[in-house]
Amino acid sequence: MPRPDKAAVVAELKEEFQTSSGAVLTEYRGLTVAQLTELRRSLGQNARFRVAKNTLTKIAAKEAGVTDSEVLDLLKGPSAIAFVKGDVVEAAKGLRDFAKENAALVIKGGLIDGKPMTPEEITKLADLESREVLLSKLAGAFKAKQSQAAAVFQALPSKAVRLVQALADKRGESQ
């Protein structure tokens, strides 16, 4: 590639590193173009799967502030990166599921919210439910606790009223 083209690729990759919430590094040796297209579709709207030269990717990562040698050392062999803009769990699930079906895709590791991740950690992340599901479960738990508290607070005055009524009825009977 001529020098201006390489600079443009480095600039694009640098922007991807800076604007992404996560980057998952994979090895794609043996995948066909059709399989790569299928993988890109399976990742959805919030992730972008890029194939770039390792040297250019390392330069872009360093320019973007990625200094962790664990991540940079993963850039060996035919590497591709899934840059995640939204829900990292959804993208991790897409990569894990595709890797199960296609043994040629190997998850090498990644960088999520600036922290290096091993392939095992990315697989564990894929086992989690999505952010929206977890938030809805949390909201449901809060609502249930509030309903229980409201029932307790409502029960106390009603018990007191019934007690006073029972005492009044008893006094009325005794007179």
UniProtKB/Swiss-Prot annotation:
Gene Ontology BP terms: translation
UniProt keyword terms in alphabetical order: Ribonucleoprotein, Ribosomal protein, RNA-binding, rRNA-binding
Primary gene name: rplJ
Annotated Gene3D superfamilies: 3.30.70.1730, 6.10.250.290
Protein name: Large ribosomal subunit protein uL10
Phylogenetic classification of the source organism: Bacteria, Bacillati, Actinomycetota, Actinomycetes, Streptosporangiales
Family: Belongs to the universal ribosomal protein uL10 family.
General function of this protein: Forms part of the ribosomal stalk, playing a central role in the interaction of the ribosome with GTP-bound translation factors.
UniProt keyword Ribosomal protein, yes or no: yes
Gene Ontology cellular component list: large ribosomal subunit
GO molecular function terms noted in the UniProt entry: large ribosomal subunit rRNA binding; structural constituent of ribosome
Organism of derivation: Thermobifida fusca (strain YX)
Quaternary structure note: Part of the ribosomal stalk of the 50S ribosomal subunit. The N-terminus interacts with L11 and the large rRNA to form the base of the stalk. The C-terminus forms an elongated spine to which L12 dimers bind in a sequential fashion forming a multimeric L10(L12)X complex.
